[in-house]
Amino acid sequence: LLMTARMDRRQVVLNKSLIDVPEMAEGVKKELSCLYPGKPHTICIINELPAGLQVMADGMYIENVIRNLMENALKYSDAGVRIEVSLSIVNERLRVSVKDNGWGIAPCHQRKLFTQFYRVPRSEEQQQKGYGIGLAQSKYIINEHGGEIMVKSAEGEGSTFTFIIPCR
């Protein structure tokens, strides 16, 4: 909630340094495996980045975005979910995509996903804990890095969340 207050006041300060995105994604993967030991899942990191590439970004905030997208993929899926985290360069920009085969999101809700406190209505058995701030924070962070974040989803087929930021 502190981050939300800072966003509202436009007081988020980025502390950019060179970061190793594949290492960061692997760390989040390990962390989530510990947090969700009772939910069978597979997380694959597909690293298509040039060897040794480092990106100039705020590591703490970018790691938060990656964690939020990966954790949402776990939370909003049934047991056995397969999550693919793809890391690549497109037009000299870092592209990170998190794809799952989970519940998916209806088009009418996709427009509102990045709105603060918005939560997709779910059936009682699909309802998850949360405040509806993670995607709004992620959008803010990516925008502050000069990038963009988007979603592609279909109900019953899963979702792909992608963000793109400059490498420098």
Segments (PLM) and residue ranges:
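Short helix-loop "hinge" at the ATP-lid/N-box region of the Bergerat-fold HATPase_c
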Residues: 73-74
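Short conserved segment of the HATPase_c
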Residues: 105-117
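Conserved glycine-rich
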Residues: 146-147
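Short alpha-helical Gxxx[C/S/T] motif in the catalytic ATP-binding
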Residues: 134, 138
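A conserved beta-strand-to-alpha-helix junction within the catalytic ATP-binding
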Residues: 15-30
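Conserved micro-motifs of the catalytic ATP-binding
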Residues: 9-14, 52-57
